[in-house]
Amino acid sequence: MNEKLVKSVFRRLRRRAQRPLERVPRLTNRDFDLLQSPRALLLDLRSPFAFSSAFIPGSVNLPGFESPALLSAVGLIAARSIYLVTDSPHAIERAAKFFDRFDDMQIGGWFPGKAVEDWRAARGAAGTIEHITPDTLAIRLAAWKTVVADLRDAAAFRRAHIPDAVRIPLNNLTGALAGLPVETSLSLVCEIGTLCSFAGSLLWNAGYRQLAIVKGGFAAYVEHGLPLAES
């Protein structure tokens, strides 16, 4: 049998013999330098609102690690060292079980939620993403102060969308915005608001810093009786 394959199987069996919380070490602010590696991927598993209020620059929001398929959708499944920000043992366990299937993606440890404040104290400003109501969005649109980035699928977008919205598929976020200056104010909309913090974290990392998430997503916008367009 191929020696490399044997070693791979052995590593997986050894990892599975341990409970996730036993083999994923807790990290502190003394471990922030680990995040400087080009292989590092920091997944912030806190809620969208907690993440948007303050996050470590470069992190990706994946609340509760409940939708790991999103990582594949945006090309983040690759040879990486994974670090987590969370206070949830269940989220750590879900992440550990998911990454067990990959030989070249290892969880290096987890930071508690307070690590964001530790980062701010030690390294400077944390990232933030605004949350706005549908009514606030309507006011900004009327004043031409924002561009709506719609994350829904093509069929839903064709049926109805916010006037002048730009559809940006998750697997081509920055490509869909090509030519749009990073200083542009973007208001993110998905079906009910659950995808926006994930997409927002990726856009923030790509240089777009004037970001807002529409609370309740497109469903809330419709409930407010605001204008719609069709393709």
What are these regions (language model features)?
Residues 1-24, 40, 48-147, 151-231:
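Rhodanese-like catalytic fold shared by cysteine-dependent sulfurtransferases
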Residues 45:
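Metal-dependent catalytic core segments for phosphate chemistry
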